[in-house]
């Protein structure tokens, strides 16, 4: 449904008269079948499967007659790859000198985007910060009156609009960027927190714990940054809702009641009394180069104005520490989106438009 909406909206935006039925379902199926096949090894950036994917995209753009932006279709993306050695690492919550080591995978997932061989956190106090959002345009600041430096921010996924369904509150049921896990880690880093625990909940996250466990286990990829990730949170983590319930009970807090309070702009952060986080993460660090793949079609009237259409081409690749079928093919995430983008690009390659069209298949970092 989302893909169909994207296709129809793209037709409206560009003001084309050609019939929608030129978008061929058979082509979508063909691209998905190829990109999600075992031959493409899960399309991990920097892997053989990733290289094969990039070549496939380039070839398809060439078949359409869409030129590259400059010289080549590849736009270089330098990558850092960090893999936590779970045998040598731990994450624990302590109450009254009694540590609870959270099981990696079944109770928590944790990693660091700092490009170092190891990070550690000692006796970091836990504080519940609602949704962990600072959004001046909505009159919202979950960190108000709080110095979170050196502390561990515990927060909910998504934003308050999801629960209230009030279209005037953020974007109602539809998630804004403030609701995404990426934003939450970024904002906590700006606030000076040392670690973050995001509480998983299937409905607002839009995926079950199994997806969290799979996505954040093993190798984590980030853009190779000038500061080597020093501006990032030391420890980024998710915990299950069951673990969260236990922790709030340990702190004599009612999580359900606090969730309701966190739906209002006057919410005030709450110290999780007596709870501290300790962690030691041992990292294996590697670097590689991958690419976004892009093509462009010039507009006839306003060539310096661009309509951007994009989809990420990558997925999880191969989980080398797993036995059996360890290829994460990613048919839905995101061979389907990439296929839709290719079919849109093919359609518009034969259509004259006032503005230029930039087609970008990227690695979302």
Task: Put a short name on every predicted segment.
Residues 33-36, 126-129, 152-156, 195-199, ...:
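Structural recognition of the beta-strand scaffold that forms the well-ordered cores
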Residues 18-22, 38-48, 78, 89, ...:
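Second-shell loop/turn segments in exported
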Residues 131-213, 304:
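A conserved hydrophobic secondary-structure block that centers on an alpha-helix together
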Residues 16-68, 79, 88-89, 209, ...:
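N-terminal hydrophobic or amphipathic helices/low-complexity stretches enriched
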Residues 173, 177-179, 204, 317, ...:
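Acidic/histidine-rich catalytic neighborhood of metal-dependent amide-processing enzymes
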Residues 41-167, 271-273, 281, 290:
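Noncatalytic luminal/extracellular "stalk/propeptide" segments of secretory-pathway proteins
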Residues 4-12:
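Sec-dependent N-terminal signal peptides
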């Amino acid at each position: 449904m989302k893909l169909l909406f994207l296709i129809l909206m793209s037709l409206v935006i560009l003001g084309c008269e050609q019939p929608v039925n030129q978008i061929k379902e058979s082509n979508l199926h063909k691209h998905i079948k190829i990109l999600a096949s075992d031959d493409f090894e899960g399309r991990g950036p920097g892997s053989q499967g990733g290289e094969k994917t990039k070549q496939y995209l380039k070839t398809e753009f060439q078949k359409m007659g869409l030129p590259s932006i400059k010289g080549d279709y590849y736009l270089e993306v330098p990558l850092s790859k960090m893999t936590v050695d779970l045998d040598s690492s731990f994450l624990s919550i302590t109450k009254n000198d009694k540590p609870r080591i959270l099981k990696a995978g079944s109770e928590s997932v944790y990693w660091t985007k700092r490009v170092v061989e190891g990070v550690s956190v000692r006796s970091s106090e836990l504080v519940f910060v609602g949704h962990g959002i600072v959004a001046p345009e909505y009159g919202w600041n979950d960190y108000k009156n709080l110095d979170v430096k050196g502390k561990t921010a515990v927060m909910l996924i998504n934003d308050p609009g999801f629960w209230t369904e009030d279209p005037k509150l953020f974007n109602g049921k539809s998630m804004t960027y403030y609701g995404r896990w990426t934003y939450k880690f970024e904002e906590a880093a700006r606030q000076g927190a040392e670690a973050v625990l995001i509480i998983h909940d299937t409905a607002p996250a839009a995926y079950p714990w199994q997806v969290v466990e799979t996505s954040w286990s093993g190798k984590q990829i980030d853009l190779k940054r000038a500061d080597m990730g020093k501006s990032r949170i030391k420890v980024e983590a998710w915990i299950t809702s069951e673990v969260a319930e236990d922790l709030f009970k340990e702190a004599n807090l009612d999580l359900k009641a606090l969730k309701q309070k966190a739906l209002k702009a006057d919410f005030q952060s709450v110290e999780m009394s007596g709870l501290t986080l300790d962690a030691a993460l041992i990292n294996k660090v590697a670097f590689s180069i991958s690419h976004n793949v892009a093509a462009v079609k010039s507009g006839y009237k306003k060539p310096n104005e661009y309509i951007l259409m994009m989809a990420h081409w990558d997925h999880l690749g191969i989980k080398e520490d797993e036995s059996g079928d360890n290829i994460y093919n990613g048919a839905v995430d995101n061979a389907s989106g990439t296929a839709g983008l290719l079919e849109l690009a093919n359609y518009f390659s034969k259509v004259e438009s006032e503005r230029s069209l930039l087609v970008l298949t990227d690695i979302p970092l």
